[in-house]
């Protein structure tokens, strides 16, 4: 039986690092009071609000004393190629203000409309021509966007 080696896995991370990476958040089904299970064959969010370009994308490695803490453990950033991918998305206070977030997805190769301002990092759904390929999906308990909160999402994806 053939296996995907750690070197092969780190090459997958390297290929992903070279792609435009965005996180989208959405309303999902407005009747949710608790999150539905994520569908492994999902390709899109149910009701997209907007997209945010990744704030930070890097290799990382497991580290019991690491500063990056996610549900799967602690990690440290590294310049060395690894099979662990760190993704961070920091939204501004005004992004999707007043919206209720129930779903998020991380997308590769997101395509934007032409002519948008240089340096823009948050995009309403109508400013995106193609969401791209969904890498991650997570459903949440309803999260109401408040003007006094700056949302930040950290992920470590291990291949």
Language-model features: where?
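Small cysteine-rich, disulfide-bonded extracellular modules of the LU/uPAR three-finger superfamily
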Residues: 1-101, 110-159
């Amino acid at each position: 039986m053939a296996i995907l080696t750690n070197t092969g896995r780190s090459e997958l991370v390297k290929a992903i690092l070279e792609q435009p990476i965005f996180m989208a958040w959405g309303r999902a089904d407005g009747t949710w009071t608790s999150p539905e299970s994520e569908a492994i064959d999902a390709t899109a969010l149910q009701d997209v609000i907007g997209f945010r370009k990744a704030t930070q994308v890097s290799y990382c490695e497991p580290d019991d004393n690491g500063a990056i803490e996610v549900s799967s453990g602690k990690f440290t950033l590294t310049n060395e190629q690894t099979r662990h991918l760190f993704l961070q998305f920091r939204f501004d206070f005004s992004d999707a203000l007043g919206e209720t977030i129930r779903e998020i997805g991380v997308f590769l190769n997101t395509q934007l409309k032409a002519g948008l301002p240089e340096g823009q990092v948050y995009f309403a759904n109508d400013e995106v021509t193609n969401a791209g390929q969904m890498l991650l999906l997570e459903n949440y308990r309803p999260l109401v966007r408040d003007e006094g909160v700056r949302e930040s999402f950290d992920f470590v994806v291990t291949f």
